[in-house]
Design a protein with these regions (language model features):
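Feature for soluble, non-membrane regions of globular proteins
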Residues: 1-194
């Protein structure tokens, strides 16, 4: 059965970019609910023996919305928490920086594209930096959808569901995304996934 991962930082460590109250609710309540629901859905089924990624792929193909949504949200959040750190942002490791320049034509162009993907995601969803074959691509996805089901490898994800930012930013999703990008991203972790 799946369990809520322990964060690599305290619930107050990302403040004021992401408040302790937001992190308490987002990690301790929302993420925990996805895990509880997933465990209830798969208990006693063939899914119980599968890895999280295999559950996502199989349930997506079999149109098992309850299983897929909760499994995918669990995976998405696991990546999201790892992609942040206190005093994040800043310098990007050379390997990742060179790959970004190669695939996007420059870091600022990538930043703009990533933030724009999150801003323009209608309703709830995610924006992603993923490897598609050997190329980095920015995508967005609705609700719980994950690039894994499109044969991509996500290496950076930002949650743009309202529960991620509404307590701190109200309806200012662009400000949330800019702060996430400039002040929270753990570039060393993202680089390690290349």
């Amino acid at each position: 059965m799946f369990e809520l991962p322990k964060l690599d930082y305290s619930n107050s460590a990302l403040s004021p970019i992401m408040s302790e109250q937001t992190l308490d609710l987002h990690h301790g309540k929302h993420h925990q609910t996805y895990i509880t629901n997933l465990n209830n859905f798969i208990k006693g089924s063939d899914y119980e023996k599968l890895s999280l990624e295999d559950i996502i792929k199989k349930s997506s193909n079999e149109k098992k919305a309850g299983i897929f949504n909760n499994a995918s949200q669990h995976w998405n959040h696991n990546l999201f928490w790892k992609c942040m750190k206190p005093n994040g942002g800043g310098n990007v490791p050379t390997k990742l920086e060179n790959k970004i320049k190669e695939d996007f034509g420059g870091f600022e162009k990538f930043r703009e594209e990533f933030i724009n993907a999150g801003v323009t995601q209608f309703g709830s969803g995610w924006c992603w930096l993923s490897l598609k074959e050997d190329k980095l691509v920015v995508t967005k996805s609705p609700n719980a959808e994950n690039p894994i089901i499109h044969n991509m490898k996500p290496i950076l994800g930002c949650d743009v569901w309202e529960h991620s930012y509404y307590l701190d930013y109200r309806n200012k999703r662009p400000a949330y995304l800019e702060n996430f990008f400039d002040k929270l991203i753990n570039w060393e972790y993202v680089d390690s996934l290349l």
